[in-house]
Curated annotation (Swiss-Prot):
Its EC number is 2.6.1.1. Changing R150A: 80% decrease in activity. Changing R45A: Loss of activity. Homodimer. Its cofactor is pyridoxal 5'-phosphate. Substrate binds at R45, G46, Y148, D149, R150, R400. The keyword Transferase applies. Pyridoxal 5'-phosphate binds at S109, S110, L111, N197, Y229, S262, T263, S264, K265. This is Aspartate aminotransferase.
């Protein structure tokens, strides 16, 4: 499958002054017509649609009256159990192809755990730290771009110096990463390994092995391996999941990876189960702090999810429903981008096989203008630059499209409007 749509050999940039002027007049007229429709459409976040949330309606009645015992006899109604119940941990271990001992099950948000492990490293240091990160003169963090804005918000909150590296089709630019980690101030990096937000790119095993084996100057260096879209295919095929913790152990770096995933875009976005996969030493460090923060996760909800899925194949069955719901929306976005923009050579976009986003690169210098025009037309887009640390896209060209929430009919109107805004911003750029 194509990863990036091919740009036209003819570009708006090649139009002479008269032709670009006429084109600008025409597209401005279309934009004014768009504004007159008083639209109110939202493409900002990768939220599941109501149809997708309905797939998990059965959860609202689970585990059911009298069903409160986990497989090991744990009464899920009571306190305790920092690791989570084995029922749901085993399902996720089977789904990801890892030992169940590697998996901790938590509450709804894996992002909460990411914040915890970074904040605890900052306050206390992690189990490989010489001192807390807050005592370091500078903490630097590697950020593959374009990437996930909420990741960058966490490292921004702690004042880390964020260093951008390209997110390529096979994963982060490893030549750049391997050079950066020679600096002991570089303490970690973000990675979304499967159907990455927003490009849809997937880390290859070769890149994963390089991440596992590379020498780092900081002994407490950590990779936050956020496998948010591990099973979120748009086709009938599921991606191969890399046992990244196992790779780290095999390479002699068992504590390098903090790996995460969750059911947030599988069942109910605000009421699911998160999973933390890491080494035995890291788990001991984590539960040592987590046991002070709280007494344990929502085990009733974990049991409900275990009953709902049944086994790993049950998870895949649910994901096939999601794929059937999402694929027509992604296809509609790609169809409109191709029909409206391809002939003018003003944009390039990813063609993902899974995940929740399409990454759109417009004429450099115009992304913020496209977002501004879209807002004027009643179409909300994620802010230009949001896929970069500190919201600063050096080329001002990237926009993230989130097709999941609106019905196809609304999505078609919104994307036709976005295409008009891309063309108008490009025409303004080349006319000046």
């Amino acid at each position: 499958m194509r990863r990036y749509a091919v740009m036209s050999s003819v570009s708006l940039q090649d139009f002479d002054a008269e032709r670009i002027g006429l084109f600008h007049e025409d597209i401005k007229r279309k934009f004014d017509e768009l504004k007159s429709k008083n639209l109110k459409l939202d493409l900002t976040r990768g939220k599941p649609s109501s149809e997708q949330l309905d797939f998990a309606d059965e959860l609202l009645a689970l585990p059911g009256k009298g069903d409160f015992k986990a497989a090991d006899g744990t009464d899920v109604r009571n306190y305790g159990g920092l690791d989570g119940i084995v029922d749901i941990r085993q399902i996720w271990a089977d789904l990801l192809g890892v030992p169940v001992e590697q998996v901790l099950a938590g509450d709804a948000s894996s992002l909460n755990i990411m914040f915890d492990v970074i904040s605890w490293s900052y306050i206390f240091g992690n189990n490989d730290s010489v001192q807390p990160w807050s005592k370091e003169e500078t903490v630097k963090w590697i950020c593959p771009v374009p990437g996930y804005d909420r990741h960058f918000s966490i490292t921004e909150r702690f004042g880390f110096e964020m260093i951008s590296v390209p997110m390529n089709e096979d994963g982060p630019d490893m030549d750049a990463v391997e050079e950066l980690v020679k600096n002991p101030q570089v303490k970690g990096m973000w990675v979304v390994p499967v159907f990455s937000n927003p490009t849809g790119f997937t880390v290859t095993e070769d890149v994963a092995k390089r991440l596992s084996a590379m020498e780092t100057a900081a002994p407490d260096f950590r990779v936050v391996w956020d496998n948010a879209y591990a099973v979120h295919t748009l086709t009938d095929e599921f991606p191969e999941v890399i046992d990244i913790v196992g790779l780290g152990e095999a390479a002699g770096n068992p504590n390098r990876f903090w790996a995460f995933t969750s059911t947030s875009k599988i069942t109910l976005a605000g009421a699911g189960v998160s999973f933390f996969l890491t080494s035995a030493e890291n788990r001991k460090w984590y539960t040592g702090h987590a046991g002070i923060r709280g007494i344990g996760p929502n085990k009733v909800n974990q049991l409900a999810h275990a009953r709902y899925f049944g086994d790993a194949e049950g998870v895949r069955a649910v994901m096939r429903k999601h794929a059937a719901s999402l694929a027509p929306k992604f296809n509609k976005v790609l169809e409109i981008l191709d029909s409206r923009l391809a002939e003018y050579g003003v944009a390039q976009w990813t063609v993902p096989a899974g995940g929740y986003f399409i990454s759109l690169d417009v004429v450099p210098g115009t992304a913020s203008r496209v977002a501004e025009l879209a807002k004027e037309a009643g179409i909300a887009l994620t802010g230009a630059g949001s896929s970069y640390p500190l919201r600063q896209d050096p080329e001002n060209k990237n926009l993230r499209l989130a097709p999941s929430l609106p019905p196809v009919e609304e999505l078609e109107v919104a994307m036709d409007g976005v295409a008009t805004c891309v063309l108008l911003a490009a025409a303004e750029h080349y006319a000046n």
